[in-house]
């Protein structure tokens, strides 16, 4: 149900006469209100199918864009979906559009704290296995290791779109700025830049991790 197309690059108006600003319009991706996590979700579900799994375990909270998109995708595919909900992550319990959508998608919630995430993932895996399913955890094993490359490759592919756009429009980017949380989008863009050896600077503006931890994650990816 997820159709990925080459999203447009739009020039933005600016009073800055020395620099030109452009935006890659991934908000136009036509699934569950769009955004970069749509590309992640497409890669996760394809990987799930390649591994012959038939149920999905997601991780996050009710404010998460990725959880919203994956919950919607599982609902459309009639795939059982369990959400590992770290209740220590976000204290705010107010209703949002994300939380309303997730709750309506029939997600089975398993609550945990920061120190019990692995146990919660194992509980979800055991429950699904007992029901006869082959569970797929989006982040790999119970420690969240093994699938780092899956969301990354979605934005390595997106870099191909940017590279082709640059050649077609004879306009070449010096910098790419993005909001960076789990660092998967940034890692994928860096992989694309390294592939083409174009020396474009990929600058992540962290919305969660500190600089030291962000660099460690990117280096590990």
Task: Show where each model-derived region lies.
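PLP-dependent amino-acid enzyme catalytic core
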Residues: 1-221
């Amino acid at each position: 149900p997820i159709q990925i197309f080459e999203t447009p690059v739009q020039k933005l108006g600016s009073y800055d006469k020395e620099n030109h600003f452009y935006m890659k319009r991934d908000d136009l991706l036509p699934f569950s209100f769009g955004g970069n996590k749509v590309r992640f979700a497409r890669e996760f579900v394809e990987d799930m199918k390649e591994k012959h799994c038939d149920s999905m375990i997601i991780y996050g909270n009710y404010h998460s864009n990725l959880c919203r998109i994956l919950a919607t995708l599982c609902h459309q595919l009639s795939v059982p979906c369990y959400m590992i909900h770290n209740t220590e992550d976000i204290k705010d319990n107010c209703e949002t559009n994300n939380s309303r959508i997730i709750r309506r998608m029939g997600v089975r919630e398993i609550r945990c704290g920061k120190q019990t995430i692995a146990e919660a993932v194992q509980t979800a895996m055991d429950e699904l296995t007992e029901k006869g399913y082959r569970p797929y955890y989006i982040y790999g094993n119970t420690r969240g290791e093994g699938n780092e490359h899956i969301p990354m490759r979605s934005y390595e592919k997106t870099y191909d779109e940017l590279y082709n756009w640059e050649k077609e429009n004879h306009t070449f980017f010096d910098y790419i700025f993005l909001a960076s949380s789990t660092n998967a989008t940034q890692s994928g863009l860096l992989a694309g830049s390294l592939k083409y050896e174009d020396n474009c600077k990929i600058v992540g503006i962290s919305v969660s991790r500190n600089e030291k931890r962000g660099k460690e994650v990117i280096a590990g990816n």
